[in-house]
Curated annotation (Swiss-Prot):
Family that this chain belongs to: Belongs to the EPSP synthase family.
Compartment list: Cytoplasm
UniProt pathway annotation: Metabolic intermediate biosynthesis; chorismate biosynthesis; chorismate from D-erythrose 4-phosphate and phosphoenolpyruvate: step 6/7
Pfam families: EPSP_synthase
Organism of derivation: Shewanella baltica (strain OS195)
Domain of life: Bacteria
PANTHER family reported for this sequence: AROM/DEHYDROQUINATE SYNTHASE (PTHR21090), PENTAFUNCTIONAL AROM POLYPEPTIDE (PTHR21090:SF5)
Record's protein name: 3-phosphoshikimate 1-carboxyvinyltransferase
Keyword Chaperone assigned: no
Residues the record lists as binding phosphoenolpyruvate: 22, 96, 124, 172, 345, 387, 412
């Protein structure tokens, strides 16, 4: 197994341009596919999850042209639903942002589509989405365990009507349903059961749908109306914002060991909820400066916080490791959906924080972290989870440094993360 040793870092300073958002990249690729016209996507993320989406679209007959560095994609829309005369089998790795939306989109047309994946994705639920699609007439068959991929879709289109979907596990299910609803045969009324998690991710979806010419009536996130007869039309160009979750590591670095760190590609105009991570750092004592498309973090003595972080689930992971450098006990609440991500992130985070000496209480949907008097060095397991690797790079700011196992797992969203991280040191 490959390991990366991060030696102690005294101070960080510099500027990082953040790669494109995974959430926006895969949503925009799918909407561009369903749209009429050609769409040019710029600052597209070049990572495993996006490659799985692109490979699947190509297999489904979608024509696109990628720039040499894979960050500009010119895609010819189908002007409607995806259909195939021959049976198709698509491999989607561990990419939830490809598996869930494609599962929904492939029910719209005609054909037989089988979606396969890595073993971890087979443990990540999709049942709430499939239940909703079945209410609209979809024929979806599970190939192994009920409620989980792999699965086969025998597509004949979706009817309109009323549909219920659970909102308390993952916002990706609702996102997938929203994106396909305009192409159903009739108007769709979506009723959300339970408290909707990760609402800002739904805002990303609605903003992109609007950019492609579709109107959704949002009744306070409890009900969504999508009137029949709409279609997606390419806006011509789509700029993919920098990934706000990826920005969190550099902002935390500035807060812990600044110096001053500036991230560009996200700012106050961002449509991503994870930019609010900077507000949490500010509550902890960091100095934060906002621009339209940049954020600056300057270091200070950090103090613990006790907050509901359901609105920033991915970026909240960075608070867990930043908490090791804060005075007092930090509590991150309402994060049950950490458990159904690339790994069970609550269990993984608790295990690895204890390795470096932290006192940790792992609840069903919260984590409580008290830093040790002296942080221990350790070998950090990353569970094939990109965010575990990037979060624990913060331990380079301890006097003993840290070793990261399987650092290349960052290829899921940020292949050259550790190179960029090293560029801030000095």
């Amino acid at each position: 197994m490959k390991q990366l040793r991060l030696e102690p870092v005294v101070q960080v300073r510099g500027e990082i341009n953040i790669p494109g958002s995974k959430s926006i990249s895969n949503r925009a690729l799918l909407l561009a596919t369903l749209a009429q016209g050609t769409t040019t996507l710029t600052n597209l993320l070049d990572s495993d999850d996006i490659r799985h989406m692109l490979a699947s679209l190509k297999q489904l007959g979608v024509n696109y042209r990628l720039s040499q560095n894979n960050t500009v994609c010119e895609l010819d829309g189908l002007g409607g639903v995806i259909s195939s005369e021959s049976a198709q089998e698509l491999f989607l790795g561990n990419a939830g942002t490809a598996m869930r939306p494609l599962c929904a989109a492939l029910t719209l047309g005609q054909g037989e589509f089988t979606l396969t994946c890595e073993p971890r994705m087979e443990e990540r639920p999709i049942g709430d989405l499939v239940d909703a699609l079945r209410q609209l007439g979809a024929n979806v068959v599970y190939l192994k365990n009920d409620g989980f991929p792999p699965l086969t879709i025998n597509a004949t289109g979706l009817s309109g009507g009323d549909v219920e979907i659970a909102g308390d596990l993952s916002s990706q299910f609702l996102t997938a349903l929203l994106m396909v609803a305009p192409l159903a045969k009739g108007s769709v009324n979506i009723h959300v059961k339970g408290e909707l998690v990760s609402k800002p991710y739904i805002d990303i979806t609605l903003a992109l749908m609007a950019q492609f010419g579709v109107t959704v009536i949002n009744h306070d996130y409890a009900r969504f109306e999508i009137v029949a007869g709409q279609r997606y039309v390419s806006p011509g160009k789509v700029l993919v914002e920098g990934d706000a979750s990826s920005a969190s590591y550099f902002l935390a670095a500035g807060a812990i060991k600044g110096g001053e760190v500036k991230v560009t590609g996200v700012g106050r105009l961002s449509i991503q909820g994870d930019v609010k991570f900077a507000d949490v750092l500010e509550k902890m004592g960091a100095e934060i400066e906002w621009g339209d498309d940049y954020i600056i973090a300057r270091g200070s003595q950090l103090t613990a916080v006790d907050l509901d972080m359901n609105h920033i689930p991915d970026a909240a992971m960075t608070i867990a490791t930043a908490a090791l450098f804060a005075k007092g006990t930090t509590v991150i609440r309402n994060i049950y959906n950490w458990r159904i991500k690339e790994t069970d992130r609550l269990a993984a985070m608790a295990t690895e924080l204890r390795k470096v000496g932290a006192e940790v209480e792992e609840g069903n949907d919260y984590i409580k972290i008290t830093p040790p008097a002296v942080i221990n060095t350790a070998e950090i397991d990353t569970y094939n989870d990109h965010r575990m690797a990037m979060c624990f790079s913060m331990l380079a700011f301890a006097d003993c440094g840290i070793t990261i196992n399987d650092p290349d797992c960052t290829s899921k969203t940020f292949p050259d993360y550790f190179k960029q991280f090293a560029s801030l040191q000095g």
